[in-house]
C-alpha cells in the first residue's frame, strides 16, 4: 500500500513538473525619466516612462503609483493615476506612461523618485495600431512668432472607417531619452475613412524647451503610437 502511495505521489509530482506554466502578460519598464518644471504659476514633477509587455499574453496597465523625493529622501509630490496611452498591449508591444505631481513646497527640489506599475490580463478590447510618420519642427514660423511642434501623420490602412483614434508622441534626444510626452484624440464624434490620412500637431511647451537648453539637451526626433481600441464581442 505504501509503495502504491509513493508511486501515486511521484506520478503527480512528475505531472506537475511537466505541465507548462500558464501564459501571462508581464510589464517591463524600459525607461523612466524625471523632469522638474517650475514656472511663475506652477511647480511640478513629471515622470515619462516607456513600458513593454514582455510576457506571452495581452496585458493592460491597471494602476500606478509615482512618488518624488527631495535630497533627504522625504516625499514631496505623488500621483496615483497612470496615464497609459495604449489600453491593451500584445506580447512585445510597448506604450508610454505619463505621471506627474505638484510640489506644494516651493523650496523643495525633486532629487529622486519611485514608479510602481501594476498590470492585468486584458481580453476586453483589441487595440489596433495604425501606421504613422513623425516629424519634429523646432522654431516653426507662425507669423510674428515661432512654436515647437511634433507632427504625426496617421494612415487608416483598414477597409473601414475608424472613430476615436488616439495618438501619443514622445519627444526624444540623440540617445533616445524621453524628453516629453503628449497625446491627442479624435474622440467618438470624428473619424478617419478607409485609406485616408490625417495630421496631428502637438506643441512642445516653452518651459520644457527652456529646461532642455539649460541642461544642454537637444530634441532630435519623435516616436509615436497611433491606435484605436475595438471592443471585443
Provide a role label for each language-model segment.
Residues 3-23:
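Sec-dependent N-terminal signal peptides of Gram-positive bacterial secreted proteins and lipoproteins
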Residues 41-48, 63, 144-151:
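Short, solvent-exposed loop/turn segments enriched in Ser/Thr/Gly
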Residues 51-56, 154-158:
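Asparagine-centered strand-capping/turn motif at beta-strand->loop junctions
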Residues 56-61, 75-76, 161-164, 178-179:
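Short acidic/proline- and small/hydrophobic-mixed sequence motifs that coincide with surface turns
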Residues 59, 64-68, 162, 168-171:
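Short, structured motif recognition centered on aromatic/hydrophobic residues
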Residues 68-78, 171-182:
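Short aromatic-acidic-glycine turn motif
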Residues 76-106, 181-210:
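Intrinsically disordered, low-complexity Pro/Gly/Ser/Thr-rich segments with frequent PxxP/GP/PP motifs
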Residues 102-146, 205-233:
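Terminal connector regions
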Amino acid at each position: 500500500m505504501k509503495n502504491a502511495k509513493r508511486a501515486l505521489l511521484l506520478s503527480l509530482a512528475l505531472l506537475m513538473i511537466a505541465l507548462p506554466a500558464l501564459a501571462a502578460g508581464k510589464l517591463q519598464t524600459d525607461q523612466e525619466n524625471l523632469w522638474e518644471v517650475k514656472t511663475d504659476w506652477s511647480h511640478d514633477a513629471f515622470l515619462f516612462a516607456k513600458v513593454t509587455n514582455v510576457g506571452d499574453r495581452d496585458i493592460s496597465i491597471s494602476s500606478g503609483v509615482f512618488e518624488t523625493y527631495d535630497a533627504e529622501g522625504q516625499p514631496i509630490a505623488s500621483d496615483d493615476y497612470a496615464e497609459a496611452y495604449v489600453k491593451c498591449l500584445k506580447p512585445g508591444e510597448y506604450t508610454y506612461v505619463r505621471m506627474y505631481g505638484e510640489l506644494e513646497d516651493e523650496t523643495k527640489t525633486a532629487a529622486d523618485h519611485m514608479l510602481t506599475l501594476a498590470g492585468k490580463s486584458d481580453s476586453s478590447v483589441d487595440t489596433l495600431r495604425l501606421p504613422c510618420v513623425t516629424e519634429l519642427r523646432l522654431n516653426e514660423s507662425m507669423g510674428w512668432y515661432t512654436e515647437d511642434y511634433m507632427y504625426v501623420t496617421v494612415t487608416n490602412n483598414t477597409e473601414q472607417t475608424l472613430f476615436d483614434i488616439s495618438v501619443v508622441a514622445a519627444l526624444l534626444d540623440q540617445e533616445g531619452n524621453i524628453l516629453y510626452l503628449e497625446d491627442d484624440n479624435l474622440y467618438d464624434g470624428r473619424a478617419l475613412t478607409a485609406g485616408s490620412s490625417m495630421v496631428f500637431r502637438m506643441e512642445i511647451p516653452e518651459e520644457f524647451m527652456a529646461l532642455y537648453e539649460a541642461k544642454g539637451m537637444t530634441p532630435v526626433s519623435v516616436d509615436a503610437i497611433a491606435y484605436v481600441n475595438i471592443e471585443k464581442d
